Amino acid sequence: AASDVYKRQELGTQPIGKLLLQYAIPAIIAMTASSLYNMVDSIFIGHGVGPLAISGLAITFPLMNLAAAFGSLVGVGASTLVSVKLGQKDYATAQNILGNVVTLNFIIGIGFSILTLLFLDPILYFFGASPDTISYARDYMVIILLGNVITHMYLGLNALLRASGHPQKAMTATITTVIINTILDPIFIYLFHWGIQGAAIATILAQIISLVWQFKTFTNKNELLHLRRGIYKLRGTIVKNTIAIGMSPFLMNLAACFIVIFINKGLKEYDGDLAIGAFGIVNRIVFLFVMIVMGLNQGMQPIAGYNFGAQQYHRVNQVLKLTIYGATAVTTTGFLVGELMPELAVSAFTTHEGLIQLSATGLRIVVIFFPIIGFQMVTSNFFQSIGMAGKAIFLSLTRQLLFLLPSIILLPLCWGSAGIWWSMPISDLAASVVAGIMLYRQFKIFKTHGNKLKVEN
């Protein structure tokens, strides 16, 4: 446990650039791996099952988003709390948070599965399924939902591994899952001819294997955080605080879920089932870059949180700047790929000409303001890591509800399906402006605080 304490102190003393690399690189590798994981499923399904199966898979995105929303409600909230508690040297509470995460994920994971499985067909039709695509969507989702409690537990424990100073172990768990999934996918789809169900079975099996390994890590008595009797009973304050902090990513995912439903329904209306598949492909490509930025954000979180708690505002300032530079480099790369070679990127997923055309056109539009979106994502995450959940929620919801939703509804009235594609970059632009204003105001506050502290010390 002593080495863990020392590990936490390095967050307040070591050079920021070195720390950010040390914390962000494992998270970036893990996030890239998990978005590749989604891509691999799409690629094998696209080539091994067919273009309509890609549309069927894309229809399940909102439901997967919804499941992820409940996962992040617990995972993000608890890991932020653990970071703060370890910073305050309150190890007993940190232990209890770990136990409560296991209990909460169990309850939410099973509850979610039961409710969604009972009404699966109506949900999928509401999400934009058609008689041609429903069977693909249903086959995939039934298996994913049966394994939902495993997914929740796996994501929740991974967030805690990172927060308790083991970013490498969290990365290992994610990469293991991806590798196993990538090996099992072609075996189940091509060899056993299980179709889209094979992809779902591969996903859940891979998570089970990683989960077993995570439990092994957390049962080690020498760990600062370890599973033991008496920590599983839900405690009001822990549950309340976890949910309060996790509310921001939860609402973000919830909003994203509804956005995707509107996009899918709109595209289907103008361009038919294939257009939903096109959005699915564009989503996967864009997601790769977004996930890398999220990895950077995860690396920033413990550093910003700890130094904010220790009132070292100059270090908070430094880590934020570095993270924004990194994020902008990543999203600019995404912009170049989408503008210069969209057909190439898209053809990884399908050989179907019509689907390639629809997807490439969409990709070109979606990444047009991509260079500035990194800044907006970092800012929203920054407010979350220093415990200003309200501001983080406001930022993420302005993009989704204030800008994106109205655009998706109004723009197609003039421009048809192009309006739906254009609504995405337009709302990115607007949200970045809002983020810039909020960040500027926050730093004015830090400056006055920082000067006050210098005088006092």
PLM features: residue spans?
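Transmembrane helical elements of multi-pass membrane transporters/channels
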Residues: 22-41, 143, 177, 206-210, ...
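Short alpha-helical transmembrane segments in multi-pass integral membrane proteins
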Residues: 3-24, 82-149, 193-246, 304-369, ...
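Structural signal for membrane-spanning alpha-helices in multi-pass inner-membrane proteins
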Residues: 116, 159, 185, 189, ...
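Hydrophobic transmembrane alpha-helices of multi-pass small-molecule transporters
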Residues: 66-69, 181-186, 211-215, 287-291, ...
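N-terminal transmembrane alpha-helices
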Residues: 11-48, 62-77, 81, 106-113, ...
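Short runs within selected transmembrane alpha-helices of multi-pass transporters and secretion channels
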Residues: 75, 144-162, 173-181, 199-212, ...
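Small-residue-rich hydrophobic transmembrane alpha-helices
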Residues: 54-114, 151-170, 278-336, 340-342, ...
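Helix-terminus/linker motif at the lipid-water interface of multi-pass membrane proteins
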Residues: 36-55, 124-131, 187-194, 257-284, ...
